[in-house]
């Protein structure tokens, strides 16, 4: 007798869903909401003055189980400074044909240079376009940022950058300079 009741319970679920209004998704015209912690595409972040956070340590590439990240570090010079430390990521590539979106690269990054956004539409009809370089991965320059290479903020050390003690560069409007 209990097996018969189990079958009736299954039919009740089916019968109940037959009379519900069908749910139609509006995707791609109207994409649904994305969870705040969703693992979407990667982004290389910048400091408030525009210098890159990536120091070219390659820890993200070592942590990637799919071998989807390639990093080639280089030394900063007095003439060309891209990050506050001694090194920067000269070449940075993520192969989205291999990436499994696990986020281990994010956890491995010591400077929080690499994060994941909530963007998920990265499809392309060309395989070569799914290998993203620094040009696509770097966060866009915000107001008060200067495109690298440039010197560190006056009076600041690389420790100040890592501790978050750097503010955006604010240009002085023309005509407001002191006439001394």
From Swiss-Prot:
Catalysed reaction, written as an equation: a quinone + NADH + 5 H(+)(in) = a quinol + NAD(+) + 4 H(+)(out)
Compartments, record wording: Cell membrane
EC number(s) per entry: 7.1.1.-
Swiss-Prot/TrEMBL keywords: 4Fe-4S, Cell membrane, Iron, Iron-sulfur, Membrane, Metal-binding, NAD, Quinone, Repeat, Translocase
Segments of this protein annotated with the region Disordered: 145-180
Membrane topology category: Peripheral membrane protein
Binding note for cofactor: Binds 2 [4Fe-4S] clusters per subunit.
UniProt-listed PROSITE patterns: 4FE4S_FER_1 (PS00198), 4FE4S_FER_2 (PS51379)
A GO CC term assigned to this protein in UniProt: plasma membrane
Class of the enzyme per the UniProt entry, highest EC level: translocase
Residues the entry annotates as binding [4Fe-4S] cluster 2: 64, 99, 102, 105
Domain of life: Bacteria
UniProt-listed InterPro entries: 4Fe4S_Fe-S-bd, 4Fe4S_Fe_S_CS, NADH_quinone_OxRdtase_chainI
BP terms from Gene Ontology: aerobic respiration
Statement: the UniProt record of this protein carries the keyword Amino-acid biosynthesis: no
Residues annotated as binding [4Fe-4S] cluster 1: 54, 57, 60, 109
HAMAP family named in the record: NDH1_NuoI (MF_01351)
Function of the molecule: NDH-1 shuttles electrons from NADH, via FMN and iron-sulfur (Fe-S) centers, to quinones in the respiratory chain. The immediate electron acceptor for the enzyme in this species is believed to be menaquinone. Couples the redox reaction to proton translocation (for every two electrons transferred, four hydrogen ions are translocated across the cytoplasmic membrane), and thus conserves the redox energy in a proton gradient.
Assembly: NDH-1 is composed of 14 different subunits. Subunits NuoA, H, J, K, L, M, N constitute the membrane sector of the complex.
Protein name as it appears in the record: NADH-quinone oxidoreductase subunit I
């Amino acid at each position: 007798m209990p097996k018969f009741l189990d079958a009736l319970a299954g039919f009740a679920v089916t019968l109940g869903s037959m009379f519900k209004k069908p749910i139609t998704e509006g995707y791609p015209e109207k994409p649904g909401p994305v969870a705040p912690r969703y693992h979407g595409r990667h982004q290389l972040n910048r400091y408030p003055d525009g210098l890159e956070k990536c120091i070219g340590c390659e820890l993200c590439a070592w942590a990637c189980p799919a071998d989807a990240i390639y990093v080639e570090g280089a030394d900063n010079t007095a003439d060309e400074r891209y990050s506050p430390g001694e090194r920067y990521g000269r070449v940075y590539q993520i192969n989205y044909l291999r990436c499994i979106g696990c986020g281990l690269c994010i956890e491995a990054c010591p400077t929080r240079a690499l994060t994941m956004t909530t963007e998920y539409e990265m499809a392309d009809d060309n395989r070569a376009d799914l290998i993203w370089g620094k040009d696509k991965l770097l966060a866009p320059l915000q107001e008060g940022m200067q495109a690298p290479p440039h010197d560190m903020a006056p009076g600041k050390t690389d420790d100040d950058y890592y501790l978050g003690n750097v503010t955006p560069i604010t240009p002085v409007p023309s005509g407001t300079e002191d006439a001394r």
